[in-house]
């Protein structure tokens, strides 16, 4: 786990020499354990954890003007210097325009600016401390710093309405630790703080400008290529090269590395058979430049990338994905590895993982991902986030109505009607989209607050039912039915408080708002996965969550997004533009069914351990859930009853 942590004091002068400005209430000097000081008094900044040398860059203009970039950033030192001068004048968006995934911190005199990303994969947290403000890219260290208690109101909101930003607001699981929203920056001036957005806000008074589909897809291609190239141009790393204990009889370097659980040197990628991971693997293998493989580590001639496919032996139904992955791996530039997993890699199989910064649904599948990533590379591409940035949230149908583009509803509604087999589907979907387009944001929150108070959680089933349920400003989460009345009442109060805050309303159309909320939740869950399934010396790369890729995807026309199969078609066009035209049959086929079957099977296999876990759950002791209700739902789900 890696993070940066800093501090902005209210003192006008520098603190005592050697304290780096961080002096506690009792006069003691506070230093993060295992930290690397990037700059000192009076507003110090540290990098904590196992950062690589090329992941921490500091560019200085003078003693009071400097920028630190932590993570993978494709900018040159000169570009960082230009961005520093732009940020000094207040143009924060320049700090987020470079390819890669990183956190930028700028110091200009006593003003410190910390930029979060657009997706939320690199969040920024802050808390008042010792008369100033402490900030970090992880919440748990700040909670430890101020000895914070758990925020049970946040946990209740996370269970009752996980997709509703108004319910969560800026809270975290730790009382007193706050989060800045995606697309914003934290600005500190001598301890005082301000949160400012750096993205332009579109007007809702007029229809959204019509974008050219071909140019928008070309922009997505360029952004993805630059994101992949930023990783390929970074130095190659040999994991654990300095901790090899030496020769072992009968074992070569590769065998010793495998025994220590080390990833393979170089760059690799997931190859699940889906379009997102396949696109990244083919781009990384085909771009000119240094290959991802490292000479002398067992790769054959011409192989430029390690591709890893997970084969679930405990659950069937993935034959089509495996066949597509095999066809893609026939590319001579790919070195293909298939990782087989049995019952020990099913969801819920191993919940005793590392302590993560926040709770998340990824904890359930951490062992499954860890088994796959253990055979991956030191730098490993994943397709996480592609669905969230490219697909159309059902609420985007309301956006089309607001822009008077009714004819573009025909194909998605026809696809839903075909899946449901009912002639009433078009009328129901159109009515729900029309109702949402005319419903104010405040009213949507009030409706959800009333639903929680009245415990109204029933929603229609099937694909059409899921789309109809999503055609709202806000909806309850599947775990809301297990919460106590007191917990639901507290979440309802939080929602009503959200409607009374100044400037209420997201300033976005409902579909765009729901899509951004879903992306933020997915990015936060990916963060949890990175920490729970972490392999030492390995870095996971999710280019679809890079700022420039997210921006390019947001510029795609709504009429293009809502078409059935749009994601696969866009990625096919991206590959064709990059020179890859030969794709296997079935490219872009959905794969939700196998994941659902695996989750159900894992739940059945781990039913006894889960029942023991919920024998005396901490959430029940805190008054958030009824343990009896949860155990009953677990037992029913293990026996095959439908899940909410």
Regions from the PLM with identified roles:
Residues 128, 341, 384, 587-588:
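Proline- and acidic/polar-enriched loop/turn elements at helix boundaries
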Residues 1-344, 358:
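Cysteine-centered catalytic environments shared across enzyme families
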